[in-house]
């Protein structure tokens, strides 16, 4: 997987087909139900996923398992019904997409967790291989301060 100067990936170019707007929309539909498994079927096991910011979910995750454990699993402990994420705006070019998402959720303490996200997504052979995710860091911090995960209070 070689990174070009523009930040895109151009490995296996002979197999690479541009991703379409309809395909990206279909993939992201898998996040609307709150569990995400349909979405994660389209994420490479060795995905390189960076959640920007200085909050309890921020970090550089070097595979799908680590990303899910560090983000979705933690959110599942404080959002009883999970976070329903809806893709609202998409820009797709070649093997890249920029996806604006809006989450709808209620925390254990009743706090509304309606966050906004921007994910810069890179595809290879139809799978998501790299993501840079941006979100409201202050809202995430507040969520975990008001709804601590047992045993992690001192780390949030």
Task: Name each region found by the language model.
Residues 9-16, 73-156:
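A beta-strand edge to alpha-helix "cap/lid" segment located at domain peripheries
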